[in-house]
Amino acid sequence: MDMSRRTLLKAQAAAAAAAVAGIDLPAEAQNLAAGEDIALKWSKAPCRFCGTGCGVMVGVKDGRVVATHGDMQAEVNRGLNCVKGYFLSKIMYGADRLTQPLMRVRGGKFDKNAELQPVSWDQAFDEMARQWKRVLREKGPKAVGMFGSGQWTIFEGYAATKLMRAGFRSNNLDPNARHCMASAAVGFIRTFGMDEPMGCYDDFEHADAFVLWGSNMAEMHPILWTRVIDRRLSAPHVRIATLSTYEHRTTELSDQSLIFQPGTDLAILNFVANYIIQNGAVNRDFVERHVNFRVANTDIGYGLRPEHVLEQRATHANEAAVSQPSNFDAYARMVGEYTLEKTEELTGVSKERLLTLAKTYADPKIRVMSLWTMGFNQHVRGVWANHLVYNIHLLTGKISEPGNSPFSLTGQPSACGTAREVGTFSHRLPADMQVNNPEHRKHAEEIWKLPPGLLNGEIGYHAVQQDRMLKDGKLNAYWIMCNNNLQTAPNTNTETYPGYRNPANFVVCSDPYPTVTAMAADVVLPTAMWVEKEGAYGNAERRTHMWRQLVNAPGDARSDLWQLMEFSKRFTTDEVWAQEILVAHPDYKGKSLFDVLWRNGSVDRFGLDEIAADHENFESKQFGFYVQKGLFEEYASFGRGHGHDLAPFDRYHEVRGLRWPVVDGKETRWRYREGHDPYVEKGAGWQFYGNPDRRAVVMAAPYEPPAEAPDQEYDLWLVTGRVLEHWHSGSMTMRVPELYRAFTGAVMFMHPDDAQKRGLRRGQEVRIISRRGEIRSRVETRGRNKMPPGRVFVPFFDASQLINKATLDATDPISKQTDFKKCAVKVIGVATAERGAE
């Protein structure tokens, strides 16, 4: 057929994306539109990978996904996909896909020291229920826990939070988003009283300058990067500045790169604020009407175990989140310490580049979009980093309007929609509510139709704390879903793996593939993936989007949602709730958790006749009602009327997502701004209505050093992260042949001078050693990542190179998010003789 200009451009873009990874596109990825001669059924879905939320069209034939291409009706990506997105059709069909439950069995009974053997779902659930009941009986709800995911669908995350909090009365539920988005979430709430960005992707087409803080968008958010570059090339006045600790593909295309000493981004942020004040660039009217000032407690520790010497020395380790009221003059004095000279000396960034950056923010005519991700958030002062970039936008009034936007990019497809909005963190409930707030618990109990006082008000164990408590034998029944924690947790040798094999613990892992984590578990449950189930994600711009089940999962694989709901049938309230609650509310006595949580007149109120006639829905047909619709509508009731309004369920299947709050059928692009946000009163201009006084907070916080730095023995900074071709731990992308061939294994990126000093050659095998553990990798002195002297980078996608054996389990003491970007290592070549002896 004839190819239109737009189709040709799309094909060229697809080829370019594949060329970046050094691969050819398969024929199915080039099939941009299905002709009548191709008997495929096409349906919409969001991409399975990052938090961008690209739309894809999924082609199905004979019960199998055989093709995907970018959805031209999707506003996010406009028909484009990155190289990972073009190979979505292959992620579900790895040769080692798990299709039946596995359990460590010897002589027909569970034995923690036995090998994993195939069992039935009933056998697996029966043993799980026995272990959960034993632990609850002997130790109570504090000894059971679950580690979830920003890759859970909204329905799965909501079901998990109900089962854990209302069923088992435990708040030991946390997502792997703790490792990537916790600092951003806490920064939003402490500044604006509500989580998630005020802007949206439309800002890309309006900004005059883009400032990237710790974000390699070209590889980690490539589709959004194309929008940045398109804006840059379309408008000659637009500029891009990238701040990082090393050079990468994003810095290559930036107008200015600022390579700073690890951790000193805080000093740069305070310098910019100081420049704005000293040069009369403060938007006084905005600040006086819309801003309060506070000062943070300092010397707050590093989130290590309480007995660690750094925690013992910290003045405010137990009061890390505390701040005090302040004023503009006090704030100006604090940031006034960050002079141009001091900042240059501390950061290693030249005065010229620092001034250019500061002038960009200070100029009232330049609309600025600040963008950040893991470089900011995986930081022992990540919450402060988020505060300090908001300070700049608030001082200048460059916020909540087209092109003026501080924007936190997300890493997982539903880190926003599931982890944050649903509230699967150990301290949260849906719609920004908190478990330690009695009024919030009361509201949840009313929506969930629970006895008053049932919900537990004690904040649960966060992700790193869960690993520590498993090791210490205090967390004994543990379920990991939709993540690969043993590969991605920090300090895994010392703090993570011991807990999995602790004889006192029973560990379950739900996963589609035999990951490192699955192989260490006591029970492995085979999980349905992506379009093998009906789902919903929420992306980085507050866009909620849904998809139908398009194919069936292989063998006995079941979705996380089915697993959670089916497992609840094995418990009655008498077995999991306190007797005083049942005595006071006898109507609940003897009921199964399934009946209390799901057959409650709310979740089960939509019948099977409402399911799309031309699509499967395994969970709903198993349980006899439209599960996903019931869960969504109950969940949505938390936020409607409170600034988190979601549209009716059916509307999402008609569109390519909607950005909340959705009021009177209309989505909101810019929050807190009159004329854009229906919650802002007429004549107010801006209202940050998450806070009672409707003002945002400027938080004064200084530079403080990282938890660990290089010394004479461990003389290199280690940075970890991702690469374009692989996603997270690689459990999906490493099973796609084209992506595997494009980047077959992790390497250690190093400056050539550092290699030469150590007598190392490119491609040579080396030992990367920290105070906690070591791995082997190979030296790379060329390529995409150009390291300054004294720093090395190792991606974490490779299960044969578990770089997190070396990382430090230091966290931001406020958000509890891990710092994967800063620890000290040494690198030693593997001698020929040593290799020969192995």
UniProtKB/Swiss-Prot annotation:
Catalytic activity: 2 Fe(II)-[cytochrome] + nitrate + 2 H(+) = 2 Fe(III)-[cytochrome] + nitrite + H2O
HAMAP family named in the record: Nitrate_reduct_NapA (MF_01630)
Superkingdom classification of source: Bacteria
Residue numbers binding Mo-bis(molybdopterin guanine dinucleotide): 84, 151, 176, 180, 213-220, 244-248, 263-265, 374, 378, 484, 510-511, 533, 560, 720-729, 804, 821
Originating organism: Methylobacterium sp. (strain 4-46)
GO molecular function, one term: molybdenum ion binding
PANTHER family registered for this protein in UniProt: PERIPLASMIC NITRATE REDUCTASE (PTHR43105:SF11), RESPIRATORY NITRATE REDUCTASE (PTHR43105)
Residues that, per the record, bind [4Fe-4S] cluster: 47, 50, 54, 82
EC nos: 1.9.6.1
Function: Catalytic subunit of the periplasmic nitrate reductase complex NapAB. Receives electrons from NapB and catalyzes the reduction of nitrate to nitrite.
UniProt keyword Cytoplasm present: no
Protein name: Periplasmic nitrate reductase
Family: Belongs to the prokaryotic molybdopterin-containing oxidoreductase family. NasA/NapA/NarB subfamily.
Domain 4Fe-4S Mo/W bis-MGD-type stretches: 40-96
The protein's required cofactors: [4Fe-4S] cluster; Mo-bis(molybdopterin guanine dinucleotide)
InterPro entries: Asp_de-COase-like_dom_sf, CT_Nitrate-R-NapA-like, MoPterin_dinucl-bd_dom, Mopterin_OxRdtase, Mopterin_OxRdtase_4Fe-4S_dom, MopterinOxRdtase_cofactor_BS, Periplasm_NO3_reductase_lsu, Prok_molybdopt-oxidoreductase
